[in-house]
From Swiss-Prot:
Protein's name in the database: E3 ubiquitin-protein ligase RNF13
Compositionally biased tracts (Acidic residues): 292-304, 339-356
Organism: Bos taurus
Sequence intervals crossing the membrane: 183-203
Assembly information from the UniProt record: Interacts with ERN1.
Classification of source organism: Eukaryota, Metazoa, Chordata, Craniata, Vertebrata
All residue ranges annotated as the PA domain in the record: 65-160
Pathway in which this enzyme or protein is active: Protein modification; protein ubiquitination
Length: 380
């Protein structure tokens, strides 16, 4: 699951980077505004800036080539004179219209009805370019030709050198720059998808890390099952391997299954917040099969009694095996020393064999509460 999300994240990032680079390179190479390429009878060219209208058809990708005709009347607020008829070919004619006196859509519609393939509206007493629009939906539905807007200086130059009567022709170059919504919306969609994938990836990784950390730590109920021993002088352990302080009487020690003991205040945070292993030998504190299985097995072993069961059997809890083994070894040592003493007594003083001899054998066994219980058995 994590691998598939990572691969998906990588592919989405690569696609996002490629599209971003190509998009910005494409936008930097394309012009911001459309142009009018004008050619006179000597084939000398000149370029004029224009601004396409917000209604009507767009210019074809290859541009629109035609002959420029002055509108009659110039404002085109009423039906205008149609273009001349050419004998050799139909030709394409573009009309030049003066601004003011009526709406832009009305001017362009009159040019369309007269038979022109495009309309150029020029400003009056200004070279500012205006974006032509319309509020009449009925008129907009009827307009099928493209139209552009130019400044007054450009219009005067076109009239002087590049009209049909002067032997010139023009080419309306389309606007190649994409509108903002054309590239901004896909860009935002790609960015949004990448952000969503990043959030999903981070959430998945966070959940997996939390689950892994929780699995490697010891729960509070598991910690309570580990035995606690109150230290006394003479015990086997003397120094805490975590804080390096010597044990003192009354210190509470946490005994791990590996027979290592630590201060409760030192080892408990390690087990519950870091790892459920011994800080020294790295042995697991809790078996991987689960506490329930270990508890069941220990209870079954405790209930099973046979002829091979030792008289001083260790406690069933695996966590107290270390102290149980220690107590059993000390008990065996005391019994051996007692028997040796009896043999020497019998060899040196045989006359006292008939007297009663109290033989004391001390059996030391560690009780579940962690304290030694001394039982004295009197044999006669």
């Amino acid at each position: 699951m994590l691998l598939s999300i990572g691969m998906l994240m990588l592919s989405a990032t690569q696609v996002y980077t490629i599209l971003t680079v190509q998009l910005f390179a494409f936008l930097n190479l394309l012009p911001v505004e459309a142009d009018i390429l004008a050619y006179n009878f000597e084939n000398a060219s000149q370029t004029f800036d224009d601004l396409p209208a917000r209604f009507g058809y767009r210019l074809p990708a290859e541009g629109l080539k035609g002959f420029l005709i002055n509108s009659k009347p110039e404002n085109a607020c009423e039906p205008i004179v149609p273009p001349p008829v050419r004998d050799n070919s139909s030709g394409t004619f573009i009309v030049l219209i003066r601004r003011l006196d009526c709406n832009f859509d009305e001017k362009v519609l009159n040019a369309q009805r007269a038979g022109y393939k495009a309309a150029i509206v020029h400003n009056v007493d200004s070279d500012d370019l205006i974006s032509m629009g319309s509020n009449d939906i009925e008129v907009l539905k009827k307009i099928d030709i493209p139209s552009v807007f130019i400044g007054e200086s450009s219009a005067n130059s076109l009239k002087d050198e590049f009209t049909y009567e002067k032997g010139g022709h023009i080419i309306l170059v389309p606007e190649f720059s994409l509108p903002l919504e054309y590239y901004l919306i896909p860009f935002l969609i790609i960015v949004g998808i990448c952000l969503i994938l990043i959030v999903i990836f981070m959430i998945t990784k966070f959940v997996q890390d939390r689950h892994r950390a929780r699995r490697n730590r010891l729960r509070k109920d598991q910690l309570k099952k580990l035995p606690v021993h109150k230290f006394k002088k003479g015990d086997e352990y003397d120094v805490c391997a975590i804080c390096l302080d010597e044990y003192e009487d009354g210190d509470k020690l946490r005994i791990l299954p590996c027979s290592h003991a630590y201060h409760c205040k030192c080892v408990d945070p390690w087990l519950t917040k870091t790892k459920k292993t011994c800080p020294v030998c790295k042995q697991k504190v809790v078996p991987s099969q689960g506490d329930s299985d270990s508890d069941t097995d220990s209870s079954q072993e405790e209930n099973e009694v046979s002829e091979h069961t030792p008289l001083l059997r260790p406690l069933a809890s695996a966590s107290t095996q270390s102290f149980g083994a220690l107590s059993e070894s000390r008990s065996h040592q005391n019994m051996t020393e007692s028997s040796d003493y009896e043999e020497d007594d019998n060899d040196t003083d045989s006359s006292d064999a008939e007297n009663e001899i109290n033989e004391h054998s001390v059996v030391v066994q560690l009780q579940p509460n962690g304290e030694r219980d001394y039982n004295i058995a009197n044999t006669v």
